[in-house]
Amino acid sequence: PRFGPRYVTFGGFFLATFGMLLLTRLTPDSTYWPEVLPAMIIISLGMGLIFVPLSATALFGVGDDDTGVASAVLNTAQQIGGSVGIAFLNTIATSATAAYVIANNVNPFDASAQVEGYVDAFTWGAGILVLGGILWVALVKISRKDMSAGDKAATVEVQ
């Protein structure tokens, strides 16, 4: 690989955080094209840069006999983490919406109340991504050279 997984994944955390922060600027008058779509594209690119190297890193050094089990554990952890994360951010959005409704004495279906809840959830999401990026850089020590050495060890010469 040209770049190590630490840098690629950190770049993904940066992009995803930036996209999430763009979503915190939403208002009830926001439209899809200039406000939402660019942020969603940036978040998607960032997540792609996070999950591909993360998978390679998680399976790095796992013996051939254990690759299937390690991959299954990784996929299970990603599914559970995604479900818990969505539930957590949904709870944040719902709680923030309820707090806004009570504080401002507005209808719960008022667009400003809904957007307030979403903005709080996007802010928390950005914070979680920042924390993930910091933990990634602090804890993952696999370099590009390590990954290349693993690729060379896995190759077989054919005559």
Q: What label would you give each PLM region?
A:
Residues 1-148:
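C-terminal module of multi-pass small-molecule transporters
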Residues 150-159:
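Short, intrinsically disordered terminal tails adjacent to the first/last structured region
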